[in-house]
């Protein structure tokens, strides 16, 4: 399925008169007026840095597996929550989170701070930040394609087949797109979805998620690098 943004969101914002603030907190996410996500990412860094200190002490007294369980329980939730929104932030901010990810895994494995960390991500079955973003966008786009996403999210996208009255390669593949250039950051979801093999997009949700995770770990292993979203998509071709 290929995926298009509708005008309802833009029209709603124009009708509202809002008090300007540097940022607001909504459902646990700090949204700044420039949509840079700097405040929210700084908050995540602060919260997970506390866990890094805990793990640095515990690693001397408990085995590897419980340490990784603590990572999954106390760090991963902050990285996954709302990432479909803030994962489009500038690389300058996102790199701070990736740095903490690498630091904590090196601590868990008792490795030097300069040690290449990709093998630790693979061994721990943990995604670097950009891979988390890719994984979560795949999940939400599956929901959009299968009409199980919330209405306000579904309205942001349009199927190519709903635009063209004649058959196109994209319409036959059930591709999606978004409409407005001002919402360019939201285009990454359809781009990712449209880059996936059609047979994968037609899988049930649980099988689809498993295939995506396996595919991402394979890409991480082959590239041995922290690829950006566009670089991950190129690996699919």
Regions from the PLM with identified roles:
Residues 53-56, 60, 75, 105, ...:
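Hydrophobic alpha-helix feature that most strongly marks membrane-spanning transmembrane helices
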Residues 1-22:
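Short, conserved micro-motifs composed of acidic
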Residues 211-237:
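C-terminal helix/juxtamembrane-tail motif
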Residues 151-188:
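Amphipathic alpha-helical
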Residues 24, 42, 46-49, 53, ...:
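Amphipathic alpha-helical interface elements that mediate macromolecular binding in regulatory proteins
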Residues 24-34, 48, 75, 79-86, ...:
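Short, conserved catalytic/metal-binding micro-motifs enriched in Asp/Glu and His
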Residues 84, 93-162:
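Short, charged alpha-helical motifs in flexible N/C-terminal segments and linkers
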Residues 18-85:
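Basic, alpha-helical interaction scaffolds
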